[in-house]
Amino acid sequence: MRCCIRLLPVLVALGMVPLTVEANEPGLTPAEVVRRYSRTVACQIHEATPGYRQYATVTLRPDSSDGTLGVWLVGWTGDLGCLGGNATHLVQMTLVEQRGFSRRVVSPVVIDHDPLPGLVLNGLRDIQFSNGVLTVRGTTGRQAFGTFQEITLRYRYRDGWEHRDRRFELLP
């Protein structure tokens, strides 16, 4: 009983301390969100090398005046799922959105880890977005095997909730 009486002030004091638990660290850029995400879902993630990009980011929809609703696409290369075989180190595109709160409160979140249909590249040269069209420049194959190719793919971006299942359409 005496032990409980001595412990009571400590428990009361602990109950008065505000405990803050956040699952989302505020203030991160879309590229940093994807950098952290990629390290949890992939292996063999290397820094950019000359002529190739890593964590290249394009803005698809700018933040609104209150700092919400921005949408970005971040391109990176790695072995998604850590499969560890030939041709498993590929270009990945990750769609990120700032939802509901400004970046001061929460960072953007990953909303789609595979938004681009038909994208199979093993090197990312560049991504650009202009007038609703996303251009992805990259490489496939290996020079040592004589299969190396430079590839350019173009996608139409369709914004809005009604297109959430198919935001990008591969253009001819």
Regions found by a protein language model. Name each.
Residues D66-D79, Q128-G138:
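Acidic/hydrophobic-patterned starts of short beta strands in beta-sheet-rich repeat architectures
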Residues D79-A87, G141-T147:
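Short consensus segments that form the blades of beta-propeller domains
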Residues H89-Q98, E150-Y157:
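Beta-propeller blade signature
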Residues A48-S64, L121-D126:
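Signature of short aromatic-glycine-proline-rich micro-motifs recurring in repeat-based ectodomains
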Residues L19-A23:
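Sec/Tat signal peptide C-region and signal peptidase I cleavage site
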Residues N24-H46, N122-P172:
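Acidic, small-residue rich beta-repeat scaffolds with periodic aromatic anchors
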Residues L7-V17:
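Bacterial N-terminal signal peptides
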Residues R104-H113, R164-L170:
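Beta-propeller fold detector
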